[in-house]
Amino acid sequence: VNWLSMLGGGVGIHVDIRSADDKSVGVMPHLKIYDAACLAYRQGRTRRGSYAAFLDVDHPDIIQFLEMRKPTGDQNLRTLNLHHGVNISDKFMRLIEKSMVNADADDSWELRDPHSHRVVEVVSARDIWQRILELRMQTGEPYIVFIDAANRALPSWLSDKGLKIHGSNLCTEIFLPTSEKRTAVCCLSSLNLEYFDHWNTNEQFIPDVMEFLDNVLQYFIDNAPNSVERARYSALRERSIGIGALGFHAYLQSKRIPIESVLAKSINYRMFSHIKEECARGDEILCEKRGPCPDAKDAGIP
């Protein structure tokens, strides 16, 4: 993890450590180590390290985990330098939906040890959901990851290999599979929407951005040290890149358009429809130049 940060990556960690018992101290003491590592290791040469931890909503340590960024309480259980997200399952949300319709509905939620699968405690799903919403209002976190929905959207040529999504990245922008052989890697960039009118008519702009990101990914594959071999293997097999956006509010301000107006909504739709279409076209151009990624090629996808 520290090596990935030193190489310039923001890091997401799925914490599947078993709950506290006579052999394990649970999740929080280990997260304190990552919390300290944020200060001890830089992200490349630009800024301090930054990590995000993800925990399943049925983990026995979920309550302590949810509250780890609160400024008050036991400092041994606080990790203020570490970001965090909770993996919410369909089963959990069905309980919440049922409880919203019927206040007397049974919302019993089993917390299970991730290794033995033994039920450690039964709690109220409503109480956990309420805690999540309150903490998001107070601290802005935890991130919410609908993990079952993410896995349903995983391309079949990855899921057929037995690969599964266990969490997200530093800022919950992407969902890539991880395994004992793979540490997910994605090369990201953002388009500045403040200057949308300058580049949206340039047919080469987004394809060039995509080729640039793929070049950066290739540089990582060619130069990554052996200590991050799983990350290099994942990058080689999947060649994942991602394009986001920033500056939408600045664009609206420059046009004196209210952000909650119908016009702003229409502009937002037009911008992101354009980006989606151009990314699809850029993907085809990149594939014609360099061929499909190995995972897709193995699945017979041209």
What are the functions of these language-model segments?
Residues 13-17, 48-52, 77-85, 104-115, ...:
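Short coil/turn segments at secondary-structure boundaries
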Residues 1-23, 27-30, 41-44, 135-235, ...:
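Function-dense linear segments that define catalytic or interfacial modules
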Residues 21-100, 230-231:
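Domain-level cores of phosphate- or acyl-group-handling catalytic modules
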Residues 25-32, 60-61, 83, 87, ...:
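Conserved active-site and cofactor/substrate-binding residues in soluble primary-metabolism enzymes
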Residues 67-68, 74-139, 147:
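Polar, glycine-rich mid-to-C-terminal structural blocks
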Residues 17-21, 57-61, 150-151, 271-275:
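Acidic, glycine-rich active-site loops and adjacent beta-strand->loop/helix elements
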Residues 208-232, 236, 257-302:
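Internal maturation/activation junctions in enzymes
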Residues 20, 41-53, 72-77, 111-123, ...:
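Inter-helical turn/loop segments and adjacent helix faces that build the functional surface
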